[in-house]
């Protein structure tokens, strides 16, 4: 890649527009992912609720945005980066859930609301973080084993 192929946003307004576009793409996919947790049955409903609670708590979403932008800079279609963007946010959220636990920082609040262990209990929060770590691997596999990749 040469420097001529990639242009940085000319100004903050352009950067902000791209950032908002990427966040919108990500948030839509994240909603789908959180909804799909429920498809796994009622047996683990508390676990999925806790994972969704933490994933949907907001934040800047800089990691998924960077995944989209890295894909674009390398000449890819940003839609192909959606699984990676979801996975990286799951890993980040998993780390926040575990960091807030009483055995670590024991934080009561995260992103302006009760931390996962305060809202759902310590045991459920621990397992929700673990589940997000496992689900991140699943979404990376989606990225690696698409039908297009299999054809190469």
Located regions from the model:
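Short alpha-helical functional segments enriched in proximate histidine and acidic residues
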Residues: 33, 93-94, 139
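Conserved small/polar residues in nucleotide/adenosyl-binding loops
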Residues: 145-152
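Conserved N-terminal diphosphate/IPP-binding helix and adjacent helical/loop segment
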Residues: 1-84, 97, 104-105, 110-111
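Catalytic-loop motifs flanking and including active-site residues across diverse enzymes
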Residues: 62-63, 86-89, 128-133
